[in-house]
Amino acid sequence: MKNKRVIKKNFEFQEIINYKKTIKNFCFIIYYKDNDQSYLKYGISVGKKIGNAVVRNKVKRQIRMILRQNINEIGTISKDVIILVRKSVLKLKYATLSKSLIKLIKEIK
């Protein structure tokens, strides 16, 4: 089943990042842009400075799970969002990550 909420193409990432609307906190940088759909589309980027591939994939899985679990709260936001992960994510627990990410996404509204 194809997930229509995920941004995967490089040109889509570049288009949103070049739009230059950002919001930041200690563990995430979020680039965003309006879209014409009635739902949130997201892309996740974890740089190579953050651990090895196993650690990076774990962080991406956690972020995807946070977004899935909170889809009722954030699902109605009509934005394209790129989530860049900072190194401080490695020191935090899942609950803290969840609160931090959801708070940032709600601020975009």
Swiss-Prot record:
GO molecular function: 3'-tRNA processing endoribonuclease activity; ribonuclease P activity; tRNA binding
One protein family per Pfam: Ribonuclease_P
Record-annotated disulphide pairs: none
Keywords carried by this UniProt record: Endonuclease, Hydrolase, Nuclease, RNA-binding, tRNA processing
Biological processes, Gene Ontology terms: tRNA 5'-leader removal
Cellular component, GO annotation: ribonuclease P complex
Catalytic activity: Endonucleolytic cleavage of RNA, removing 5'-extranucleotides from tRNA precursor
EC number, as in UniProt: 3.1.26.5
Recorded superkingdom: Bacteria
Presence of keyword Nuclease: yes
Record family assignment: Belongs to the RnpA family.
Function: RNaseP catalyzes the removal of the 5'-leader sequence from pre-tRNA to produce the mature 5'-terminus. It can also cleave other RNA substrates such as 4.5S RNA. The protein component plays an auxiliary but essential role in vivo by binding to the 5'-leader sequence and broadening the substrate specificity of the ribozyme.
Quaternary data: Consists of a catalytic RNA component (M1 or rnpB) and a protein subunit.
Name of the molecule in the record: Ribonuclease P protein component
